[in-house]
């Protein structure tokens, strides 16, 4: 982000709306005012006033350049009617705007017509509220709860990268999580190296802002920033994590500036695999819960520096870099998810996969519901061969389903307990997964891949310790398999996120 942040008191400004609809500035005075609830949000010029009428859409306020422009910023402000508007003539409405907060932005973000800023103690709705609808043929990157976050909702923007040989892997998920308020905004980061080093931290911050430059909320360049309040450039406690996605979904850039923790960037250049949903159903991972891949596969470039705690000296840290690019055949992608309720409330098991083996790319998000929903398997998955989709699996088959009949593309997921692979730390003690993709096409083709745990990545408990303790685990996995009934045998690498929850 550019611009020099500065602290300033709230601003009070008046403007008059005459019967002909023209806005006439009355001038502005800088004064300290008590905090007021706000219901207007927009990009304005500090030192000027907005033409936006009260109750207009929060992220579509027009801008007006009245007076000296002192700082381009994103502002919170409240508009209220001013009594005695007589000096402006009969029929004139006079409104007062009180700027309560400003957040410096890049020029591009300040000019964006669609802005979602959540921060402070006013961002959470009092009761659960619905998110906005799926937009067909869109990455749906603008927040679904743009103005107020539902207290039960979670929105996620996920970016990852991996070396072609599995020697290094990285993932970050940007969360807006109403269930974790007031710590709702975090970037969950995990990294792994072939020497066994792992790094897992959450950057928890008080501010989350996402902008889109249009022409509507479903299309356009999107930028997101998770950050501390107005950090100074020399402030070693500052934390900023940001993402930037091109309007055509061709590129992404993720940047970290958290001194003493993580700095650097991840970039993607999409390979153009077909991914975008054309309907609600194509975006769903379960009824009413959405998870899909705006970028299913991309060339990735990583240049990150991590600060790792010394277990023998809490005051000492060592630096470790991760550098991946074309030389390492680095690949990755981007996932987008939003759920009206934390999926852990409804699910007992989850599996995330992104992997590459020979000409195949596979991407999976699969949930298993809790007993009151009969352990139903639901999924949003895709198998690509040479960049073309061969199984768009929106149907999840139970592990014991072994027949070949298929009326729709589907995937069967089965936990592996025998053979090579690291044993998972928590309840199920599996050594990997078998993915069996099916096509409903004329040939009724079937592909089977074994994903075996090669390196443990992250491991976080989701229950109390014990023999049946559950957890959230990540693995670098070795992939083998191919087309069933043929001599094809491919090899590759991938990553899995495996979550177990109590019933």
Swiss-Prot record:
The keyword Isomerase applies. It comes from the Eukaryota. Signal peptide: none annotated. It is an enzyme of class 5 (isomerase). Keywords: Isomerase. Belongs to the Diels-Alderase family. This is Diels-Alderase cghA. It comes from Chaetomium globosum (strain ATCC 6205 / CBS 148.51 / DSM 1962 / NBRC 6347 / NRRL 1970) (Soil fungus). The gene is cghA.
């Amino acid at each position: 982000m550019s611009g020099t942040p500065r602290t300033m008191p709230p601003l009070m400004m008046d403007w008059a709306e005459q019967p002909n609809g023209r806005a006439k500035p009355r001038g502005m005075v800088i004064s300290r005012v008590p905090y007021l609830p706000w219901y207007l949000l927009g990009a304005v010029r500090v030192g000027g006033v907005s033409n936006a009428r009260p109750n207009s859409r929060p992220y579509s306020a027009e801008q007006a350049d009245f007076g000296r422009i002192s700082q381009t910023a994103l502002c919170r402000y409240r508009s209220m009617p001013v009594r005695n508007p007589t000096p402006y003539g009969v029929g004139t409405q006079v409104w007062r705007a009180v700027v309560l907060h400003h957040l410096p932005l890049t020029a591009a973000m300040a000019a964006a017509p669609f802005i979602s800023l959540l921060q402070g103690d006013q961002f959470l709705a009092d009761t659960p509220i619905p998110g906005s609808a799926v937009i067909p043929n869109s990455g749906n990157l603008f927040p679904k709860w743009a103005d107020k976050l539902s207290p039960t909702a979670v929105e996620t923007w996920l970016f990852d990268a991996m070396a072609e040989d599995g020697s290094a892997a990285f993932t970050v998920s940007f969360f807006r999580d109403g269930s974790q308020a007031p710590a709702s905004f975090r970037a969950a980061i995990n990294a792994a190296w072939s020497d066994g080093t792992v790094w897992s931290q959450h950057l928890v911050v008080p501010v989350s802002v996402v902008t889109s430059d249009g022409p509507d909320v479903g299309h356009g360049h999107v930028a997101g920033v998770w950050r501390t309040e107005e950090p100074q450039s020399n402030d070693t406690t500052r934390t900023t994590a940001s993402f930037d996605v091109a309007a055509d979904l061709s590129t992404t850039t993720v940047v970290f500036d958290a001194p003493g923790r993580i700095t650097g960037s991840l970039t993607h250049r999409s390979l153009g695999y077909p991914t975008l949903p054309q309907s609600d159903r194509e975006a769903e991972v379960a009824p009413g819960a959405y998870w899909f891949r705006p970028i299913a596969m991309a060339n990735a470039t990583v240049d990150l520096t991590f600060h790792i705690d010394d277990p023998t000296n809490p005051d000492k840290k060592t630096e470790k870099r991760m550098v991946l690019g074309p030389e390492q055949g680095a690949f990755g992608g981007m996932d987008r998810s939003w759920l009206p309720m934390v999926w852990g409330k409804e699910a007992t098991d989850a599996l995330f996969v992104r992997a590459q083996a020979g000409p195949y790319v596979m991407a999976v998000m699969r949930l298993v519901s809790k007993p009151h929903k009969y352990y139903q398997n639901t999924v949003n998955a895709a198998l690509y061969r040479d960049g073309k989709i061969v199984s768009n699996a929106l149907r999840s088959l139970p592990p014991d389903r072994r027949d070949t009949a298929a009326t729709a593309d589907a995937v069967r997921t089965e936990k592996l307990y025998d053979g090579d692979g690291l044993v998972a730390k928590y309840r199920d003690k599996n050594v990997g997964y078998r993915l069996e993709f099916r096509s409903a096409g004329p040939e009724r083709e079937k592909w089977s891949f074994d994903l075996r745990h090669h390196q443990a990545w992250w491991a976080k408990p989701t229950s109390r310790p014990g023999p049946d303790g559950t957890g959230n685990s990540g693995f670098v996995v070795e992939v083998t398999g191919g087309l069933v009934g043929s001599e094809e045998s491919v090899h590759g690498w991938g990553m899995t996120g495996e979550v177990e929850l109590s019933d």
